[in-house]
Curated annotation (Swiss-Prot):
It comes from Synechococcus elongatus (strain ATCC 33912 / PCC 7942 / FACHB-805). The gene is fmt. Keywords: Protein biosynthesis, Transferase. Gene3D superfamilies: 3.40.50.12230. This is Methionyl-tRNA formyltransferase. It catalyses: L-methionyl-tRNA(fMet) + (6R)-10-formyltetrahydrofolate = N-formyl-L-methionyl-tRNA(fMet) + (6S)-5,6,7,8-tetrahydrofolate + H(+).
Amino acid sequence: MRVVFFGTPQFAVPTLQQLLDAPDVEVMAVVSQPDRRRGRGNQVSASPVKALAIAYDLPVWQPERLRRDPEVLSQLQQTQADAFVVVAYGQLLPAEVLAMPRLGCINVHGSLLPAYRGAAPIQWSLINGDRETGIVTMQMDVGMDTGPMLLRWTTPIALDDNSQTLGDRLATAGAELLLQTLRQLDQGHLTAISQNEAEATYARLLQKEDFQLSWDQSALELHNRIRGLYPGASLPVQGDRLKVLASLPLGLGLLLSAAYADWQDWQPDPAAQPGTVLAIAKSLGPIVATREGALLLLQVQPAGRKPLSGWDWANGLRLQEGLSLLE
Protein backbone atom coordinates (compact mmCIF):
# COMPACT_ATOMS: atom_id res chain seq x y z
CA MET A 1 0.00 0.00 0.00
CA ARG A 2 1.40 3.38 -1.04
CA VAL A 3 0.86 6.29 1.37
CA VAL A 4 1.85 9.91 1.79
CA PHE A 5 2.15 11.07 5.39
CA PHE A 6 1.09 14.52 6.60
CA GLY A 7 2.21 15.50 10.12
CA THR A 8 4.30 17.90 12.15
CA PRO A 9 4.72 17.51 15.98
CA GLN A 10 6.05 14.70 18.15
CA PHE A 11 2.51 13.32 18.53
CA ALA A 12 2.62 12.30 14.85
CA VAL A 13 6.01 10.56 14.98
CA PRO A 14 4.85 7.13 16.27
CA THR A 15 2.35 6.83 13.41
CA LEU A 16 4.97 7.63 10.79
CA GLN A 17 7.37 5.16 12.42
CA GLN A 18 4.65 2.48 12.43
CA LEU A 19 4.08 3.00 8.71
CA LEU A 20 7.82 2.89 7.99
CA ASP A 21 8.10 -0.40 9.89
CA ALA A 22 5.08 -2.05 8.24
CA PRO A 23 6.12 -4.54 5.52
CA ASP A 24 2.95 -3.93 3.50
CA VAL A 25 3.23 -0.11 3.46
CA GLU A 26 5.43 2.12 1.31
CA VAL A 27 5.74 5.73 2.46
CA MET A 28 6.14 7.74 -0.74
CA ALA A 29 6.70 11.17 0.79
CA VAL A 30 6.10 13.31 3.87
CA VAL A 31 4.36 16.68 4.06
CA SER A 32 5.12 18.81 7.13
CA GLN A 33 4.87 22.41 8.25
CA PRO A 34 7.77 24.73 7.31
CA ASP A 35 10.72 24.90 9.69
CA ARG A 36 9.93 27.15 12.65
CA ARG A 37 11.69 28.62 15.66
CA ARG A 38 11.43 26.06 18.44
CA GLY A 39 12.72 25.24 21.90
CA ARG A 40 14.55 27.29 24.50
CA GLY A 41 17.11 28.62 22.06
CA ASN A 42 14.37 29.78 19.69
CA GLN A 43 16.40 28.40 16.80
CA VAL A 44 14.89 27.57 13.41
CA SER A 45 14.63 23.79 13.28
CA ALA A 46 12.83 20.98 11.54
CA SER A 47 9.64 19.50 12.91
CA PRO A 48 9.94 16.10 14.64
CA VAL A 49 8.15 14.49 11.68
CA LYS A 50 10.55 16.04 9.17
CA ALA A 51 13.53 14.89 11.23
CA LEU A 52 12.32 11.28 11.10
CA ALA A 53 11.58 11.52 7.38
CA ILE A 54 15.09 12.80 6.67
CA ALA A 55 16.56 9.90 8.65
CA TYR A 56 14.80 7.56 6.20
CA ASP A 57 15.78 9.60 3.11
CA LEU A 58 12.15 10.36 2.29
CA PRO A 59 11.09 13.33 0.16
CA VAL A 60 9.76 16.11 2.42
CA TRP A 61 7.48 18.87 1.17
CA GLN A 62 6.79 21.91 3.34
CA PRO A 63 4.28 24.27 1.72
CA GLU A 64 3.36 27.44 3.60
CA ARG A 65 -0.18 27.05 2.26
CA LEU A 66 -0.87 23.70 0.67
CA ARG A 67 -3.90 24.86 -1.29
CA ARG A 68 -1.83 27.65 -2.88
CA ASP A 69 1.21 25.57 -3.82
CA PRO A 70 0.70 24.12 -7.32
CA GLU A 71 4.08 22.38 -7.29
CA VAL A 72 3.31 20.34 -4.16
CA LEU A 73 -0.24 19.66 -5.36
CA SER A 74 1.20 18.26 -8.59
CA GLN A 75 3.75 16.15 -6.69
CA LEU A 76 0.99 14.71 -4.50
CA GLN A 77 -1.01 13.73 -7.57
CA GLN A 78 2.02 12.07 -9.14
CA THR A 79 2.60 9.79 -6.13
CA GLN A 80 -0.55 7.84 -7.05
CA ALA A 81 -0.82 6.98 -3.36
CA ASP A 82 -3.54 4.65 -2.11
CA ALA A 83 -4.06 6.80 1.00
CA PHE A 84 -2.96 10.05 2.57
CA VAL A 85 -2.43 9.70 6.33
CA VAL A 86 -2.85 12.89 8.37
CA VAL A 87 -1.78 13.28 12.01
CA ALA A 88 -1.62 16.77 13.54
CA TYR A 89 -0.43 18.28 10.27
CA GLY A 90 -1.58 21.82 11.04
CA GLN A 91 -3.41 22.73 7.82
CA LEU A 92 -6.80 21.79 6.40
CA LEU A 93 -6.57 19.76 3.20
CA PRO A 94 -8.38 21.25 0.19
CA ALA A 95 -11.04 19.23 -1.63
CA GLU A 96 -8.75 18.48 -4.57
CA VAL A 97 -6.23 16.81 -2.23
CA LEU A 98 -8.93 14.86 -0.37
CA ALA A 99 -10.05 13.40 -3.70
CA MET A 100 -6.62 12.22 -4.85
CA PRO A 101 -5.99 8.87 -3.08
CA ARG A 102 -7.99 5.70 -3.76
CA LEU A 103 -8.79 5.10 -0.07
CA GLY A 104 -9.13 8.78 0.78
CA CYS A 105 -7.40 10.81 3.46
CA ILE A 106 -7.32 9.14 6.89
CA ASN A 107 -6.88 11.23 10.02
CA VAL A 108 -5.81 10.18 13.52
CA HIS A 109 -7.47 12.47 16.09
CA GLY A 110 -6.73 12.62 19.83
CA SER A 111 -10.28 12.56 21.20
CA LEU A 112 -13.49 10.56 21.05
CA LEU A 113 -15.13 12.49 18.26
CA PRO A 114 -17.37 14.37 17.89
CA ALA A 115 -16.03 15.68 21.23
CA TYR A 116 -13.07 18.07 21.07
CA ARG A 117 -12.77 18.78 17.40
CA GLY A 118 -9.89 21.14 16.75
CA ALA A 119 -6.30 21.84 17.69
CA ALA A 120 -5.96 20.92 21.39
CA PRO A 121 -8.16 17.91 22.24
CA ILE A 122 -5.74 16.31 24.69
CA GLN A 123 -5.21 19.49 26.67
CA TRP A 124 -8.92 20.30 26.95
CA SER A 125 -9.91 16.78 27.99
CA LEU A 126 -7.55 17.22 30.96
CA ILE A 127 -8.54 20.82 31.70
CA ASN A 128 -12.19 19.79 31.81
CA GLY A 129 -11.46 16.88 34.15
CA ASP A 130 -12.68 14.14 31.82
CA ARG A 131 -12.23 10.60 33.07
CA GLU A 132 -12.00 8.97 29.65
CA THR A 133 -10.68 9.86 26.23
CA GLY A 134 -9.28 8.06 23.24
CA ILE A 135 -8.30 8.01 19.60
CA VAL A 136 -10.50 8.02 16.52
CA THR A 137 -9.51 7.38 12.92
CA MET A 138 -11.74 9.08 10.40
CA GLN A 139 -12.23 9.66 6.70
CA MET A 140 -11.46 13.33 6.18
CA ASP A 141 -13.74 15.84 4.52
CA VAL A 142 -13.36 19.59 3.99
CA GLY A 143 -14.42 20.46 7.57
CA MET A 144 -12.30 20.52 10.73
CA ASP A 145 -12.50 17.00 12.18
CA THR A 146 -16.03 16.53 10.83
CA GLY A 147 -15.55 13.46 8.66
CA PRO A 148 -17.11 10.02 9.22
CA MET A 149 -15.43 7.85 11.86
CA LEU A 150 -13.74 4.51 11.19
CA LEU A 151 -12.14 2.95 14.31
CA ARG A 152 -11.83 4.12 17.92
CA TRP A 153 -9.78 3.25 21.01
CA THR A 154 -10.53 4.41 24.55
CA THR A 155 -8.45 4.90 27.69
CA PRO A 156 -9.19 6.13 31.23
CA ILE A 157 -7.59 9.40 32.32
CA ALA A 158 -5.78 9.02 35.65
CA LEU A 159 -5.64 11.80 38.24
CA ASP A 160 -1.89 12.12 37.68
CA ASP A 161 -1.99 12.10 33.87
CA ASN A 162 -0.79 15.26 32.16
CA SER A 163 -0.69 16.36 28.53
CA GLN A 164 2.65 14.62 28.02
CA THR A 165 1.81 11.24 29.56
CA LEU A 166 -1.66 11.15 28.02
CA GLY A 167 -0.37 12.44 24.69
CA ASP A 168 2.32 9.75 24.57
CA ARG A 169 -0.25 7.06 25.31
CA LEU A 170 -2.64 8.32 22.66
CA ALA A 171 0.13 8.71 20.09
CA THR A 172 1.24 5.10 20.55
CA ALA A 173 -2.31 3.78 20.40
CA GLY A 174 -3.11 6.00 17.42
CA ALA A 175 -0.22 4.57 15.43
CA GLU A 176 -1.51 1.03 15.90
CA LEU A 177 -5.12 2.04 15.21
CA LEU A 178 -4.14 3.80 12.00
CA LEU A 179 -2.41 0.73 10.60
CA GLN A 180 -5.45 -1.40 11.46
CA THR A 181 -7.65 1.17 9.75
CA LEU A 182 -5.61 1.18 6.54
CA ARG A 183 -5.52 -2.60 6.29
CA GLN A 184 -9.24 -3.01 6.94
CA LEU A 185 -10.09 -0.23 4.48
CA ASP A 186 -7.92 -1.84 1.82
CA GLN A 187 -9.77 -5.13 2.35
CA GLY A 188 -13.17 -3.43 2.22
CA HIS A 189 -13.98 -4.43 5.81
CA LEU A 190 -14.72 -0.99 7.26
CA THR A 191 -17.91 1.06 7.28
CA ALA A 192 -17.62 4.73 8.17
CA ILE A 193 -20.04 6.16 10.74
CA SER A 194 -21.19 9.77 10.51
CA GLN A 195 -20.57 12.02 13.50
CA ASN A 196 -23.51 13.31 15.51
CA GLU A 197 -23.35 17.07 15.01
CA ALA A 198 -25.55 17.67 18.07
CA GLU A 199 -22.78 16.21 20.27
CA ALA A 200 -19.89 18.14 18.71
CA THR A 201 -17.62 20.21 20.95
CA TYR A 202 -14.48 22.16 20.10
CA ALA A 203 -10.95 22.27 21.54
CA ARG A 204 -9.80 25.77 20.73
CA LEU A 205 -6.19 26.80 20.48
CA LEU A 206 -4.66 27.67 23.83
CA GLN A 207 -3.91 31.33 24.50
CA LYS A 208 -1.21 32.88 26.69
CA GLU A 209 -3.76 33.90 29.32
CA ASP A 210 -4.92 30.28 29.72
CA PHE A 211 -1.62 29.52 31.44
CA GLN A 212 -2.00 32.27 34.06
CA LEU A 213 -3.74 30.58 37.01
CA SER A 214 -5.05 32.09 40.25
CA TRP A 215 -5.32 30.80 43.82
CA ASP A 216 -8.96 31.97 43.72
CA GLN A 217 -9.76 28.95 41.55
CA SER A 218 -10.67 25.62 43.16
CA ALA A 219 -7.99 23.03 43.87
CA LEU A 220 -9.49 20.61 41.36
CA GLU A 221 -9.71 23.25 38.63
CA LEU A 222 -6.11 24.26 39.27
CA HIS A 223 -4.92 20.65 39.24
CA ASN A 224 -6.72 19.93 35.97
CA ARG A 225 -5.28 23.04 34.34
CA ILE A 226 -1.78 22.24 35.58
CA ARG A 227 -2.11 18.79 33.98
CA GLY A 228 -3.65 20.01 30.75
CA LEU A 229 -1.27 22.95 30.30
CA TYR A 230 1.87 21.01 31.28
CA PRO A 231 4.57 22.24 31.52
CA GLY A 232 3.47 25.87 31.31
CA ALA A 233 0.82 26.70 33.93
CA SER A 234 1.86 29.20 36.59
CA LEU A 235 0.55 30.68 39.84
CA PRO A 236 1.41 33.97 41.56
CA VAL A 237 4.02 33.62 44.31
CA GLN A 238 5.63 36.54 46.14
CA GLY A 239 5.28 38.97 43.25
CA ASP A 240 6.46 36.53 40.57
CA ARG A 241 4.99 33.61 38.62
CA LEU A 242 5.79 30.05 39.68
CA LYS A 243 5.35 27.26 37.16
CA VAL A 244 3.65 24.27 38.74
CA LEU A 245 4.48 21.02 36.95
CA ALA A 246 2.75 18.52 39.22
CA SER A 247 0.14 18.87 41.93
CA LEU A 248 -2.52 17.06 43.92
CA PRO A 249 -5.93 18.40 45.01
CA LEU A 250 -6.70 17.70 48.68
CA GLY A 251 -9.75 18.04 50.90
CA LEU A 252 -12.25 17.25 48.14
CA GLY A 253 -12.95 13.58 48.84
CA LEU A 254 -11.06 12.35 45.77
CA LEU A 255 -9.56 8.86 45.96
CA LEU A 256 -5.79 9.28 46.15
CA SER A 257 -3.13 6.71 45.29
CA ALA A 258 -1.32 4.76 48.00
CA ALA A 259 1.63 7.17 47.86
CA TYR A 260 -0.60 9.90 49.32
CA ALA A 261 -2.70 7.77 51.68
CA ASP A 262 -1.68 9.87 54.70
CA TRP A 263 -3.49 12.84 53.15
CA GLN A 264 -6.63 11.04 52.02
CA ASP A 265 -8.85 12.37 54.82
CA TRP A 266 -7.01 15.63 55.47
CA GLN A 267 -9.21 18.72 55.44
CA PRO A 268 -8.10 22.35 54.98
CA ASP A 269 -9.11 25.21 57.23
CA PRO A 270 -12.23 26.59 55.48
CA ALA A 271 -11.44 30.08 56.76
CA ALA A 272 -7.97 30.19 55.18
CA GLN A 273 -7.46 32.76 52.45
CA PRO A 274 -6.50 31.44 48.99
CA GLY A 275 -2.72 31.42 48.60
CA THR A 276 -2.06 30.64 52.28
CA VAL A 277 0.33 27.81 53.16
CA LEU A 278 -1.71 25.37 55.27
CA ALA A 279 0.95 22.72 55.87
CA ILE A 280 4.22 21.34 54.58
CA ALA A 281 3.79 17.68 53.61
CA LYS A 282 7.04 15.94 54.52
CA SER A 283 9.06 14.85 51.46
CA LEU A 284 6.25 16.11 49.18
CA GLY A 285 5.77 19.87 49.28
CA PRO A 286 3.61 22.75 50.52
CA ILE A 287 -0.17 22.52 50.75
CA VAL A 288 -1.79 25.80 49.74
CA ALA A 289 -5.36 27.03 50.28
CA THR A 290 -7.54 27.66 47.23
CA ARG A 291 -11.13 28.80 46.74
CA GLU A 292 -12.25 25.22 47.41
CA GLY A 293 -9.95 22.56 48.82
CA ALA A 294 -6.18 22.84 48.89
CA LEU A 295 -3.40 22.18 46.41
CA LEU A 296 -0.27 20.15 47.17
CA LEU A 297 2.61 21.40 45.03
CA LEU A 298 4.65 18.33 44.05
CA GLN A 299 6.95 19.78 41.40
CA VAL A 300 7.61 23.41 40.53
CA GLN A 301 9.88 25.54 38.38
CA PRO A 302 10.78 29.04 39.55
CA ALA A 303 11.51 31.60 36.83
CA GLY A 304 14.93 31.05 35.27
CA ARG A 305 15.60 27.82 37.18
CA LYS A 306 15.35 24.10 36.61
CA PRO A 307 12.39 22.07 37.90
CA LEU A 308 12.60 20.88 41.50
CA SER A 309 10.38 19.08 43.95
CA GLY A 310 7.85 21.02 45.96
CA TRP A 311 9.63 19.81 49.10
CA ASP A 312 13.01 21.23 48.02
CA TRP A 313 11.39 24.47 46.90
CA ALA A 314 9.56 24.91 50.21
CA ASN A 315 12.73 24.21 52.18
CA GLY A 316 14.73 26.64 50.06
CA LEU A 317 12.27 29.45 50.83
CA ARG A 318 11.75 28.25 54.40
CA LEU A 319 8.00 28.28 53.90
CA GLN A 320 5.94 27.96 57.06
CA GLU A 321 2.33 27.26 57.87
CA GLY A 322 0.24 30.44 57.78
CA LEU A 323 2.44 32.27 55.26
CA SER A 324 0.65 33.91 52.33
CA LEU A 325 2.30 33.25 48.98
CA LEU A 326 0.72 36.44 47.67
CA GLU A 327 2.85 38.68 49.90
